[in-house]
Swiss-Prot record:
Main location: membrane
Species this chain originates from: Shewanella frigidimarina (strain NCIMB 400)
Keyword Magnesium: no
Subcellular compartments: Cell membrane
Highest taxon, organism lineage: Bacteria
Record key words, sorted: ATP-binding, Cell membrane, Kinase, Membrane, Nucleotide-binding, Phosphoprotein, Signal, Transferase, Transmembrane, Transmembrane helix
Catalytic activity: ATP + protein L-histidine = ADP + protein N-phospho-L-histidine
Gene Ontology, cellular component aspect: plasma membrane
Membrane topology: Single-pass membrane protein
This protein's name: Putative sensor protein Sfri_3689
Transmembrane segments annotated in the record for this chain: 252-272
Amino acid sequence: MKTLLLLLIIITMPVLAQDSIVFGVHSKTAPLEWRNNGVDQGFNIELMDRIGQLTNKRIIVRRKSFQQLVKDVHDPDSDIDVIAVVSPVNMDRKLAQSDPIYATHAKAYTLQGKALINNWADLVGKRVAIKNGAFVDVFLSDHLQNFDRVDVDLYETGFQLLIKNQVDVVIAESFVARRLLPLYPSVRSSSDALIYGAFNFVANETKTELMYQINEALRQLKLSGEYDKLVNKWFGTGREKVDLTSSEKRMFALAILVAIMSAIGMIFTGFISASLRRHTKALDAELIQRKRIEVEISELSQQFQSVLDGLPNGVTIVNQELQHLWSNDNNIHLLDSDEFYYVDNNVFKLKAAVLEVLSTQKSFTADMRYQQQFWQLQIHPIANNQVVILLEESTEQHRLRQANEEASRLASLGELSAGIAHEINNPTGLIVHAVSLFTAAMKDLTPAAKHYQKQNPFWLIAGLNPDIAIEELQYSCGSIEEGAKRISRIVNDLKRYAMPHIADQYTLVSLNDVVQVAQRLTANQTKSHQISTMLCDPSPCITGDAQQLHQVLINLIQNACNACSTQPGIIVIDTHVANNMAILSIKDNGCGMDSATLKRITEPFFTTRRNEGGSGLGLSVCSKIIKEHQGEMQIQSTLGKGTQIRLIFALAQQD
């Protein structure tokens, strides 16, 4: 026996002479790391032992408190080289950190009967116990939350405070909490995972070479499958502890066997080492090639994804159950919106459209409307009973198409208006001339009629008393003359609407002068209303036709008066300059307009005052004049509150 022990000492002396790694442990939680009968064991310890074998380093285990270990690992002169801690996913500690060892998470724990915690918002205003330095603490350092934080040294301390009602919630790592729950039956799990993390080996940032060796060994264990065996051993179903005594016996027997085999195996070490070096080089070359291929595939995938994400069009792939398999998330919400209609206002049903495309295997294209926007929808069949849906905004094309159609209608209307104006002008002139003659003749015949009536008291004109008949004739002449003048005014509006104005005839026009002239010419209509003017000094000037601008403002003032016909109105006219633009504004507190009327007020012959003699050409002519002046007419109106019209022109440059 003494000889055997001596042989073991001789064999193990080279091992003792090798470099060592001081591995700090603190946990009492199976199956990670815990002490039984003075011996530390667990997944982390056995994994570190295996890493030590691969790196030819002796592993020395030292147990301290968690806070002391965290403090030591931040100290480059500490006696602790490596510890195993949990780090939040996508958040590294300010330490040298290994690849993930094992996934875990943190949840909220409360007393039995308390409300469940569905998300972070449910913690607002609560007292929450957080373990100092733990991965929950690291996560919260970059994700501030609105709750009262209570720092504790251990999760178990947090559970004790919870029982004493000194905290409302404990956020704890799942392995530790699972061990503590049987000891605290009044505590329960109250949430799904709030934070995801992973166990890692960490060391001081100055020990990057050591961490590189640990990572290389860890990856070798994963590639060889030995890591999976360790995971199955320590994390298998129902396996939280191992029989330490039997393990010690097996390890002792194994040590004896290894010692005997080591003596024999040293003879072949040289040959094996050479073979391993060749094999390692081959594996390294293959690993480098695989990593390069993975990087290329990842770059291509990211490039393809970025191209799809950068498309202005919405692209979505769905199956026949309408499950969204992939999408670049551009405007995809429209497909499920109740405001997404066909342009003819028919209701759109995504499922019906998808099923039709899948059944016919033919592409589907439709023009759609969403609020004030227009879209083109395309649905194309692809493999595996799936379709790709394309959404492209076509608002601008729709507006251009409408503008083109309106321009065509207006061109036809202009030609028609010019012909009508010419044909109506001549007979209208004859009517006006004849009515003027009749009016003058009635004045001359009135004395003669009175003289004849005295001689013949029973004389009648058209069955009426001569005085009444003459009065009716005079009224009829006035009505005919007024109607003829109205016809003439409409004809002039039609001619003006049909004939474009020549811009070369424009001169410098003061907007203040336009307001003052329009006020004088509408004084009779505005005398029953309160007119207020706020004119800019100096007056903003534009290039244009003064008479046409007078006509525009006169028409707008008359419309404002008509809108305030049921009560004395307040009409405000102002001129000002903004962003190098000259602006003329007229505002009233009249009846206002609904949205349907507002959309049509510049259409030719559209009027809401047909019974009062409106022709529907006033605002059409105004709109045309403003466009000829390269201006813009903005109209805002609220039913029952009033209307504001702003005329915006380019400010003229004055010498």
